UniProtKB/Swiss-Prot annotation:
Protein's UniProt name: Nicotinate phosphoribosyltransferase
GO cellular component: cytosol
Record GO terms (molecular function): nicotinate phosphoribosyltransferase activity
One BP term from GO: NAD biosynthetic process via the salvage pathway
Length: 406
């Protein structure tokens, strides 16, 4: 299910290093949110607990993985790699239970530098266990198009690999540079492996966010920073200054490496106010993760124009619920205006067109507080807001989006 400590997204490791360097004493709490209609079972919760206690707790960095990280990820400092070599997941940091509504209540609590690696690992485990203990038909008697009812898991994986190859060829034919970003909501480890086997045949694949598969398939591990870096910073320095402090601190830690700035933590307008000339020049580009992507392209170009920066020397990385069709349209819209690339996730590792009878889980695990101070994510899409109601109300007021009584 989780085969290696590297079976995780690169940005969790890069953020872990930054937290260790700048905020080693910070305490964090994360919470799971199920945005969909799927429900869980007692059997599911018991199996998840077993996986945490018996499997994930035993993961550790091997000597070979240690050497590979040092060679392929030179931005990870030797002191951090030594820390990671000795890192162990602590099951006691994870609390899980089944609610009366058969939903999953999951909380992760502990030092920020320790708990930061749980998010992707737990989401991948939740997704795979759901499709193992609750919706089981897909891997033995699936009714997916082109797959017979008597299909075995092997034949499903083979058919799925062909589907992914078709998607990859569409992206390649249209010149779309893209990375695989699908670890957190993958249907299973085996299916994720099949996805990568297919995608490495595509010339415009630039890499994968999953460090284990980057190593296995000889592609580039891709990733920079996630929302939690900025969210956590807001609790430590104040929300009004969080974007600026977060991105200046990131530069201090990585000296210009990993230079894609995430824009929507407190809404993109708040971000652009904080992205001054120095930061706009230092960062290679911006990542779009919510809101209308076409409006975002225009806003980014406007921002660079005001700064006297040629947008054709910068890049937008799109990562919001993308599929091949959306990527192709965005590529055409950006042509001649600004460079672009795509981080494509669930539509590769848990494609809803292929698995029509059992759609992927719509779930997140988000940072809830740092040192007991609630944090929020505002986003450019209202349905993606996370945080306590009062904290959201105050945050929207601070960034100028709403009045306190709205």
């Amino acid at each position: 299910m989780i085969k290696s400590i590297l079976d995780n997204d690169l940005y969790k490791f890069t953020m872990q290093m930054a937290v260790l360097e700048l905020f080693p004493k910070a305490e964090a709490e994360y919470r799971f949110t199920n945005r969909g209609l799927q429900r869980f079972s007692r059997e599911f919760v018991e199996e998840l607990r077993r996986v945490i206690d018996e499997e994930i707790s035993g993961l550790r960095l091997t000597e070979e993985e240690y050497r590979w990280l040092g060679e392929k990820c030179p931005f990870l400092k030797p002191m951090y790699l030594e820390y990671l070599k000795n890192f162990r997941f602590k099951p006691e940091e994870v609390e899980i239970c089944l609610t009366r509504e058969n939903d999953l209540d999951m909380r992760i609590k502990g030092p920020w530098h320790s708990t930061i690696l749980w998010e992707i690992v737990l989401m991948a485990a939740v997704s795979e266990l759901y499709f193992t203990t609750i919706e089981k038909e897909w891997n033995g008697s699936t009714k997916n198009p082109g797959t017979p009812e008597s299909a075995t898991l092997e034949s499903v994986l083979e058919a799925y690999g062909e589907k992914i190859l078709e998607i990859g060829k569409v992206l390649e034919e249209n010149g779309c540079l893209f990375s695989e970003f699908g670890t957190r909501r993958r249907r299973s480890f085996e299916l994720h492996d099949q996805v990568m086997r297919s995608l490495v045949r595509i010339k415009t694949l630039t890499g994968t966010s999953n460090v284990y598969f980057a190593k296995k398939y000889g592609v580039k591990p891709i990733g920079t920073v996630g929302h939690e870096w900025i969210m956590g910073t807001s609790a430590l320095v104040g929300l009004r200054y969080a974007n600026r402090f977060a991105f200046e601190n990131w530069v201090d830690v990585y000296n210009g490496d990993l230079g894609i700035a995430l824009t929507d933590t407190f809404g993109s307008e708040a971000f652009f106010k904080d992205m001054d000339l120095k930061l706009s020049k230092i960062y290679d580009g911006f990542r779009h993760d919510s809101g209308d992507p076409y409006t975002f392209v225009d806003r980014v170009i406007e921002h660079y124009g005001k700064m006297g920066i040629d947008p054709m020397k910068k890049v937008i990385v799109f990562s919001d619920a993308l599929n091949a069709e959306a990527a192709v349209k965005l590529k055409k819209y950006c042509e001649g205006k600004i460079n672009c690339s795509f981080g494509i996730g669930t539509s590769l590792t848990n494609n809803s067109e292929f698995f029509r009878e059992s759609p992927p889980l719509n779930m997140v695990i988000k940072l809830h507080s740092i040192n007991g101070i609630p944090v929020v994510k505002l986003s450019d899409s209202p349905e993606k807001e996370t945080g306590e109601r009062d904290a959201l109300r105050v945050a929207n007021y601070i960034v100028g989006r709403k009045g306190l009584d709205e």
